[in-house]
Amino acid sequence: MLTPLQIYFPIGVVLLVAVVLAFTMLGLANVLGPRRPSLVKQTPFECGSEPIGSARERFGVKFYVVALLFIVFDIEAIFLYPWAVLLLPDGQGYPGLGWPGFISMGIFVFTLVAGLVYVWKKGVLDWAD
């Protein structure tokens, strides 16, 4: 029987090699890399074309709101996936889930749909402005 130290030793070796390799690459890049700044190196890259305007522009708050909504509904999908896997057909799923699991997930989905309707009615997703 293997001890926990014997089981996790290869993982520790791989982790140590990865850390040493990463710091070695960073050190070599710092030592061997050029240190002469120029205007071309400090210009932001925009798909090969000349940049228009400043790189320090403000973005509209709508981008952040949409990003937060994406995260909320992405987390909803993360919570829905295990529940759906537990409800496999043909008796392969978890038998103890039953109606309480279905009702609790229904409440969860209803709450998120109500939030989406609220956000939609408030005009957060309207980009016409």
Swiss-Prot record:
E.C. number(s) listed in UniProt: 7.1.1.-
Main location as per UniProt: membrane
Residues annotated as transmembrane: 9-29, 68-88, 97-117
Location within or outside the cell: Cell inner membrane
Top EC class for this record: translocase
Catalytic activities: a quinone + NADH + 5 H(+)(in) = a quinol + NAD(+) + 4 H(+)(out)
Membrane topology, as annotated: Multi-pass membrane protein
GO CC annotation: NADH dehydrogenase complex; plasma membrane
Coiled coil start-end: none
Annotated keywords: Cell inner membrane, Cell membrane, Membrane, NAD, Quinone, Translocase, Transmembrane, Transmembrane helix, Transport, Ubiquinone
Similarity field: Belongs to the complex I subunit 3 family.
HAMAP family: NDH1_NuoA
Protein purpose: NDH-1 shuttles electrons from NADH, via FMN and iron-sulfur (Fe-S) centers, to quinones in the respiratory chain. The immediate electron acceptor for the enzyme in this species is believed to be ubiquinone. Couples the redox reaction to proton translocation (for every two electrons transferred, four hydrogen ions are translocated across the cytoplasmic membrane), and thus conserves the redox energy in a proton gradient.
Subunit structure: NDH-1 is composed of 14 different subunits. Subunits NuoA, H, J, K, L, M, N constitute the membrane sector of the complex.
Protein's UniProt name: NADH-quinone oxidoreductase subunit A
